[in-house]
């Protein structure tokens, strides 16, 4: 099932500002980027984080990350090139360690999200949710200066697509959780 989400493009540009949503960052203070930082700006309304998230056929209620396969829900692309995140190719525990989430500078892990640790927290209008993803050098090379497109294609929800641009202001920046 595919939907035309062209009406949401304006909203996507506000939630993911093209020059202010994606960064390569240095988390080790060694002067070299080692992670990707995605900033999501809440421009919709205050959001109370629920205990469980349900979207299409996906739910965190009885979620077991060891049985989860993202490719069952959709495929991701960067500049039309597929991004492989199959559990067949990665150790799940190691992969979980590559993701951190920040809300109001407070750090959360994948396990925190799955256990409902964020439940009941308010994401205020204007708040930014930061997603930090540790990526190897080869992966970071794909995030070069210039314009890029990220897509998530699924049969469950409409294709999600957003454009972003990387330049001196968001390449190899020092990580700040705020």
Task: Please give the residue ranges for each predicted region.
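Terminal leader/tail segments of proteins
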Residues: 2-178
């Amino acid at each position: 099932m595919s939907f035309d989400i062209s009406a949401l493009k304006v909203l996507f540009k506000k939630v993911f500002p093209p020059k202010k949503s994606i960064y390569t960052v240095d988390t080790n203070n060694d002067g070299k980027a080692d992670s990707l930082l995605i900033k999501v700006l809440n421009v919709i309304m205050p959001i109370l984080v629920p205990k469980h998230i349900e979207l299409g056929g996906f739910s965190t209620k009885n979620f077991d990350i060891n049985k989860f396969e993202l490719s069952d829900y959709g495929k991701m692309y960067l500049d039309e090139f597929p991004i492989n995140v199959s559990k067949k190719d990665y150790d799940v525990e190691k992969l979980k360690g590559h993701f951190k989430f920040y809300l109001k500078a407070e750090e959360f892990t994948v396990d925190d999200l799955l256990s409902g640790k964020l439940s009941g927290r308010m994401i205020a209008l204007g708040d930014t949710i930061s997603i930090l993803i540790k990526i190897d050098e080869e992966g970071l090379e794909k995030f070069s200066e210039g314009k890029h497109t990220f897509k998530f294609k699924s049969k469950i929800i409409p294709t999600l697509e957003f454009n972003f641009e990387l330049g001196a202001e968001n390449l190899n920046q020092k990580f700040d959780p705020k």
